């Protein structure tokens, strides 16, 4: 794939060759995977009646998998109508920066879903709730300070990622980072609780309600000739806040699981992470950073801000004996101890 890209994609307008390469690579990847799996797994005949019975649930899953089209993809469709072509670049670059970081952290949630389903199948509610609290706490432990850090360093991150040409996209990156705080909570409520409890129809309905709200807000912006990317991030944020509210009400109504621990951890990590603000401005003043130009001073300031913020965050959580902090330290200690022991 990389060889093909470097061979056939030589200019910024080579969109069709790039699309063909990516499409062909994806098809080949699926086909080779199919052949590889086919060696060990044989086809099973399924009666038409059984397929028809399952098709309803499969259709719900199809809607659920594509509901996100009514959020960030819809935003981009509206922004492309703008006479200012740079706005779509601001939106896409900022979203990519934030998603590159957050997608790594979602693994702590995804890996627990099969085990959560297993516990529910066994009616082991205690183990189910314990695993939700443990995995969600670990996820929030990392995602919240990362999000708040990106809110502060959004413009610098954008310039480092895409050059000074896209400095104006910094505010969009910061807003996407703010959206991450809401999105992370929705990710827990939607995937670990509602979906695992076989309530995918309700989850799909909520996603579409939020998507329709986003569509209406985007249409309102479009009618008023507002195309700046930051406004469209805000419409998505508002829609996702409504989805989270609906999910919380649903979980509480049917008593699926206690949300007390999740809310306590979220509040704690947000409150502590707000301490990054004075650290950032102190470092900025010490190194006399007055612009978003990336030079040695700016890089040192960014590194100092991240380092001191991380030390402050870890120290406060250690002092108050936060369970997730202690759990993380135990894992690190055991791995380092075993490494040095060898």
Task: State where each predicted segment sits.
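Helix-terminus/linker motif at the lipid-water interface of multi-pass membrane proteins
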Residues: 7-11, 69-101, 118-119, 155-165, ...
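Helix-loop interface residues and adjacent transmembrane-helix termini in multi-pass membrane transporters
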Residues: 12, 82-85, 196-197, 223-227
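Membrane-proximal transmembrane or re-entrant/amphipathic helices at the cytosolic face
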Residues: 254-258, 263, 281-342
């Amino acid at each position: 794939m990389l060889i093909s890209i470097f061979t056939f994609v030589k200019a910024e307008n080579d969109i069709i060759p790039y699309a063909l390469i990516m499409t062909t690579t994806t098809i080949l990847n699926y086909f080779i995977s199919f052949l590889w799996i086919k060696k060990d797994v044989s086809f099973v005949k399924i009666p038409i009646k059984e397929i028809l019975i399952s098709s309803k649930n499969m259709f719900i899953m199809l809607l659920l998998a594509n509901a996100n089209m009514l959020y960030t993809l819809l935003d981009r469709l509206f922004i492309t109508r703008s006479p200012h072509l740079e706005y779509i670049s601001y939106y896409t670059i900022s979203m990519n920066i934030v998603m590159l970081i957050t997608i790594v952290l979602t693994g702590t949630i995804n890996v627990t879903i099969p085990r959560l389903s297993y516990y529910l199948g066994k009616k082991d509610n205690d183990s189910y709730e314990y695993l939700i609290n443990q995995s969600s706490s670990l996820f929030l432990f990392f995602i919240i300070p990362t999000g708040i850090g990106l809110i502060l360093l959004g413009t610098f991150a954008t310039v480092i990622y895409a050059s000074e040409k896209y400095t104006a996209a910094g505010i969009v990156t910061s807003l996407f980072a703010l959206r991450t705080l809401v999105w992370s909570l929705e990710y827990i409520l939607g995937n670990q609780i509602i979906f695992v409890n076989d309530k995918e129809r309700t989850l799909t309905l909520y996603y579409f309600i939020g998507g329709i709200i986003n569509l209406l807000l985007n249409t309102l912006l479009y009618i008023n000739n507002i195309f700046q990317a930051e406004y469209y991030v805000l419409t998505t944020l508002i829609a996702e806040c409504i989805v989270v509210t609906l999910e919380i009400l649903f979980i509480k109504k049917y008593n699926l699981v206690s949300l007390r621990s999740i809310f306590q951890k979220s509040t704690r990590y947000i409150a502590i992470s707000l301490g990054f603000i004075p650290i950032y401005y102190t470092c900025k003043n010490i190194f006399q950073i007055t612009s978003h130009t990336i030079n040695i001073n700016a890089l040192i300031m960014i590194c100092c801000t991240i380092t001191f913020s991380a030390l402050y965050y870890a120290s406060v959580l250690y002092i108050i004996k936060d369970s997730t902090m202690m759990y993380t330290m135990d894992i690190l200690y055991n791995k380092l101890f075993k490494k040095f022991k060898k």
